Amino acid sequence: MPTIQLKAMTRELCHELYKHWTNDASIYMDMHLFQPYVYDEAAVNRYFDRKGQDASRRLFAIMLGDKVIGELQLKQIDHDKKECSLSIHMQNDAVKGRGYGTQAERLAVKTAFDELGMAAVNADTIRKNTRSQHVLEKVGFRFAGEDETFQYYRIER
């Protein structure tokens, strides 16, 4: 299997990611909110500026060779509690179900523990997103609870 790398997201990589983006209906609990994605250069710039200026967040491009295939964030980084949350989104169906997300999540957990000094990483998925739940469990996250919309997971050092 080809090797995945996490690279600090740049504005250029962010545009490359979203030029080929497809919204995934499986991550929408309320289908009234689902709309096909249409690339908008100004919107991507605003997104990158907003996320990139957040000191409690690390934004990564998921790289397959020199091609960006997804985005991963370590967010809500709390150095006092030594916890953060993981968020991942793959670009489109062509890169899903191939183990790339699993590799990326493993790298992110290693980064959180080894580089950021975190003791725990949290994650959540909407209840119907069984694919994401399976990947989290495969990486070592444990089910921590649920509510009407989300299932919550946690991995500790």
List the predicted regions and their residue ranges.
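Conserved GNAT-fold acetyl-CoA-binding loop/helix
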Residues: 26-47
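Short amphipathic alpha-helical patches
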Residues: 40-45, 51, 71, 135, ...
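Short, flexible, glycine/charge-rich loop motifs used to bind or transfer phosphoryl groups or to couple energy/partner
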Residues: 49-50, 111
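Short loop/turn motifs at secondary-structure junctions and domain boundaries
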Residues: 50-56
